[in-house]
């Protein structure tokens, strides 16, 4: 792994010159983080992407793969959505002017092991284990199509096929589910020991039923032939979170039996 800065053009050229395909996943990824830090979001997401595109052009990269979001369809998502929309336009211009091939991946709701602090499922699992309580803004009727991070990773490689060149691809789950059903599932897996509380939401940056209001280039959705079942994936995430926060934070208080390891592939 090389630790660096995506606005360091010299370092970018050194790294990118050794490759034929570039995956760009760097930048500010949390909606709240982007809302709180618009300047950093513009610098990392928009300017950073421009630096990477320029380096790809200079080094004759065969394909530029960009991690976008389903929020590009929306008028929600604050500066996060704005930055992703801007990046997609930049990519289109580099394709039109410099013939830089691309694939734009619009990710839906991801979950799985090693989730960061703003991942919804990862966050509520941590709440449940530490506090025996989940506080959710909204009424739980919000709809999401969750996809396990391993399934998303497989799809992100499959798009290297030639038919996905210069394409917009949606990577999301094969089934939709209400948020309240996710929370109830987590509660059941933890022996019904969790209190679930719904509070009025002051955050207007997240969608409830659908993100579709703004209309960018339409994307094809990859339908996964094989994928991780949602319940098993959430259970695996519970084990992973429990292991990471330590044995003193959940097992004794919640009176649940956790195996030492879980075989989840």
Map each language-model feature to its residues.
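Active-site beta-alpha turn of Rossmann-fold NAD(P)-dependent dehydrogenases/reductases
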Residues: 26, 65-69, 106-108, 172
